A protein has these predicted regions:
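Amphipathic, non-transmembrane alpha-helical secondary structure
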Residues: 5, 84-87, 91, 184-188
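Conserved beta-strand segments of alpha/beta enzyme cores
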Residues: 21-23, 49, 121, 148-150, ...
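Hydrophobic residues in well-ordered beta-strands that form the structural core
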Residues: 51-52, 124, 202
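A short, charged helix-loop
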Residues: 63-71
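S-adenosylmethionine
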Residues: 127-241
């Protein structure tokens, strides 16, 4: 604490630090990496059962399509409304021939859902290198061959290497459960990667951002909005490439 105070005092001539009061407390020693697991329980999205890898399948859900997920340090348990909105849209559009692009893949839950629904192949991108490990582990947990789901680290919006690796005019479906502001940027890039009449499923959009996302899609001559769905305060916008 003394070193922190000394460092702040060195900054005082350059900025207004105010009173600079300090509080010190002890935090209970817990396994924070794994402690969240007690809150992740099996749940359903329509006819799909999503469960953590360490839980058993509830007897009443044995007839449902099973997806097992352990996100590790990547994002995505499936419990959030935005993920569920995307899953419901994937149910509508995935076919046995679908090539799927999963942007911001995280744990791989959306890509794995697409494969479980019958998609041919998934290509995922994520800024977090942990996503590559998480997806690999979750593919194994779901009995899916690793060659069915490739993941690369990088930003598809502005990284030409990633854009080239993703391929052009290739995908039947793109899905992105990110943030509204990122989707507004992403909708400019995605059209070059999906086929004509390809579907772009988006969520991560809080209701107060719905109009901004709609306006961005409507201003893009490459897309037409085909559906907007809601769950709680969250929104999914689905568009088709013209």
């Amino acid at each position: 604490m003394a070193k922190v105070k000394e460092a702040l005092e060195e900054l005082r001539p350059f900025t207004d630090l105010g009173a600079c009061t300090f509080a010190e407390s002890e935090t209970e020693d817990k396994d924070w990496i794994n402690n969240w697991k007690q809150y992740f329980k099996p749940f359903t999205v329509d006819h799909i059962l999503i469960k953590p890898t360490w839980e058993t399948v509830p007897e009443e859900h044995k007839d449902k399509l099973l997806i097992q997920i352990d996100p590790g340090t990547a994002f995505g348990t499936g419990m959030h409304e935005t993920t569920q909105l995307c899953i419901r849209q994937l149910e509508k559009y995935v076919t046995p021939d679908s090539e799927v692009l999963d942007v911001g893949t995280g744990s791989g839950i959306l890509g794995i859902t697409a494969l479980k629904l019958g998609a041919k192949h998934v290509f995922g991108t994520d800024l977090d290198e942990n996503a590559i490990t998480a997806v690999g582990e979750n593919l194994e947990a779901n009995g899916i061959a690793p060659e069915q789901f490739k993941v690369v680290q990088g930003n598809i919006i502005d990284d030409k290497t990633v854009q080239n690796e993703v391929k052009y005019e290739y995908y039947d479906i793109a899905v992105a459960n990110i943030l509204a502001d990122v989707i507004i940027m992403l909708q400019k890039e995605i059209p070059v990667h999906i086929k004509k009449n390809g579907i772009f499923i988006t969520s991560g959009i809080i209701d107060m951002k719905e109009e901004a996302v709609k306006a961005a899609f409507e201003a893009n001559d490459a897309f037409e909005i085909v559906e907007i769905t809601h769950q709680g305060e969250w929104v999914s916008v689905t568009a088709r490439k013209k």
